[in-house]
């Protein structure tokens, strides 16, 4: 009325405006975008895309009840991990496996389950913070672990890990650097070497792949 667009307010006008407002407010927040950033697996754009066939199969399955946590052969409740654990064990030669929805959850649960109240040895150069305020020292504290830093920001050697391992050591951890690098006069210990050390000392070794 003030702008002059309408002369009077009727029930039809009110209903139409309410319908428009409701439609606008109920639009999904996820929008399709075209990724022209040059980063193929962009962390803010959903990372790896699912194949169309996979999407169609998932949609078909979840349009109906499925055996998510039910073992038909035994006629009783099952475990949702059963659908994928066998494949992971076959691919990795692991004794067992479980799945969570992101890497941060995997790191936290691993630390909390295997190293709670114990010490976790990590190279000082790997105390990173990545997107979403995922900070290694904070995650360890919340998981109930005690962080033991070894080496320096630029150089960490095998003997640094060897000297830090005690009867209180619950785990040795290696952390992915994500989106930065340390260059120049540097040194680090590779995955295989740390794994061999932990086997000899009979303690778990994990690698956060980011």
Provide a role label for each language-model segment.
Residues 6, 33, 98-99:
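Short, surface-exposed helix-loop/turn micro-motifs enriched in polar/charged residues
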Residues 40-44, 71, 121-123:
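Short glycine-rich or small-residue beta-strand-to-loop segments that form or flank ligand, phosphate
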Residues 1-23:
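Long amphipathic alpha-helical segments
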Residues 17, 21, 25, 57, ...:
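Residues that form generic nucleotide/phosphate-binding pockets
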Residues 9-17, 32-40, 76-83, 107:
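Glycine/charge-rich, flexible interdomain linkers and switch-proximal surface loops
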Residues 3, 11, 26-49:
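N-terminal Rossmann-like NAD(P)+-binding subdomain of aldehyde/semialdehyde dehydrogenases
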Residues 36-37, 47-73:
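Glycine-rich phosphate-binding segment of PLP-dependent enzymes
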Residues 27, 74-210:
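Conserved PLP-enzyme active-site core in the AAT-like
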